[in-house]
Amino acid sequence: MEKTRKLTEASLLTAIFVVVTIISVGSGIGYGIYLDYIVPLFYFIIYLKCGSKYTVLSAMSGLMIVFAVLGNPGTAIWASQGIILGILCGILSEKKTSLMDDLLLGTLIGSIIMVFIDIYASKLIGYSFIQDFKETISYMAKYMTKNVPAFSNFPPEFIHSYFSTVFYVSITLIPLGTVVGVYIIGLFVGNRLNVLKGETKKKYEVIRHFRTFSRMTFCSRNLFYIMVIYTMTFSLMNKYGIKTNMAYIDTIMNCFFYSGLYFLIRDSVAGIQGYMLTKGKSMGQVRLFTILYLFILLSYFWLAAIIAILYFMSIDVKYGLREFYCEKMSTLLTN
């Protein structure tokens, strides 16, 4: 009976997906917010409601119908990216991992998915979003160097490095923004539909009361250290000019670097804030520290980032901040 119910629900939701996709793409709005956010959100909910088996069945049948009706391989390709990201968010949300682990791992895996979908799209329909965006950034660099006096005073190496950073940060924001947005909104929608249970319910409560739990949730220690080692290694490779000739691999490595760096700094600042509170500092002092740190981070990025990460690592090992706040958060969630 349960299997029949899930199959019926998956079939109904698949029909809705097909109809809405055809209308959205046919009206011209499908290549905007719909394929990038609504599709992954939709399949995140299907996963929570129907489970992995029926979600995969729904995805395969839905994509085949959309492709058969529209005859547009591009739509099927970009929709498949959204579906995979939605299912990924569903899988991560059910794991006994921290919220930050889910978001970081989702971003890292999402970067790989995005690149491979782009490769597939370039081979099938002759269009590569990454290459097109890279050409746009390159054109901007040449234009600003020629027409903006402030840029003409800098050496070519600096300009190339600056716009390369802009390119890779912008590319990184795509999987990061998609995963974080779909994950958070999906849990709120899932709660409204009463499909959350177990770990997904706990993570929903953490997000719902994030103002309270923001200083208590971190990436796991192992994942944190892995990203520290990776960012250090990647920085040294860049410093000594060690690069791969494969553009897509280079894109993935840079996405990993900037995603990891963001979560390392975020965890470090949150950990230091939490440590200050355990030592009796007031919220006003914590806020003042945060404002001053952000100012220093904008002025001396690498110095501020390294100091915060190393200091957080030292107090975490010395005082067991992760264990302390994990236990405290569990107590608050059960009350």
Where do the protein language model's features map onto the residues?
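Hydrophobic transmembrane alpha-helices
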Residues: 1-58
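Alpha-helical transmembrane segments and their cytosolic interface
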Residues: 3-6, 159-284, 288-290, 295, ...
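Hydrophobic alpha-helical transmembrane segments
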Residues: 7-12, 56-60, 76, 80, ...
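Short helix-perturbing small/polar motifs within transmembrane alpha-helices
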Residues: 8-14, 79-122
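Interfacial aromatic-anchored transmembrane helix boundaries in multi-pass membrane proteins
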Residues: 22-32, 63-91
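Alpha-helical transmembrane segments and their membrane-interface exit regions
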Residues: 40-45, 66-67, 83-95, 109-114, ...
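Central hydrophobic cores of alpha-helical transmembrane segments
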Residues: 57-65, 102-111, 282-295, 307-309
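Membrane-interface interhelical loops and short interface/amphipathic helices
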Residues: 118-165
